[in-house]
Regions:
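Short, small/polar-rich loop/turn modules that mediate ligand/substrate recognition or access, typified
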Residues: 3, 8, 74-76
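Catalytic loop of short-chain dehydrogenase/reductase
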Residues: 1-5, 16-17, 46, 85-87
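Short C-terminal tail/terminal secondary-structure segment
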Residues: 64, 75-100
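Active-site catalytic pocket residues across diverse enzymes, especially alpha/beta-hydrolases
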Residues: 2, 29, 70
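Short-chain dehydrogenase/reductase
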Residues: 24-35, 100
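Short, flexible catalytic-loop segment of classical short-chain dehydrogenase/reductase
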Residues: 14-24, 28
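C-terminal helical subdomain
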Residues: 11, 19, 35-70, 74, ...
């Protein structure tokens, strides 16, 4: 209904992002495994194709793209910015590593 008025609706779905919020998410892994923050991020990203978390600037760039004229034809879609995590079955990987 709003498309002809130039209003678009999209979603951005990031994976792990190295931020203070992401750091807090790593605390249980750090405690459980006795590892550093950097090692915790490496542990959670070891099975995604890029093997690293995103930066806040990278996620901001995705937001800027979706808000810009360069994406004027993009609507009704989801931009997944997860380093390729969607391309692998992370549920299966976690199941194999941790068990039921």
């Amino acid at each position: 209904d709003y498309g002809p008025s130039g209003i678009r609706a999209n979603a951005l779905c990031p994976g792990w992002v190295e931020t203070p919020m992401g750091d807090r998410s790593m605390e249980s892994l750090m405690t459980k495994h006795g590892i550093s923050l950097g090692d915790a991020y490496r542990l959670v990203t070891q099975h995604i194709p890029l093997r690293r978390p995103a930066t806040a600037d990278e996620i901001a760039a995705c937001c800027l793209f979706l808000a810009s004229d360069e994406s004027s034809i993009v609507t009704g879609t989801t931009l997944v910015a997860d380093g390729g995590g969607l391309a692998v079955d992370l549920t299966e990987v976690a199941w194999q590593q941790e068990g039921p």
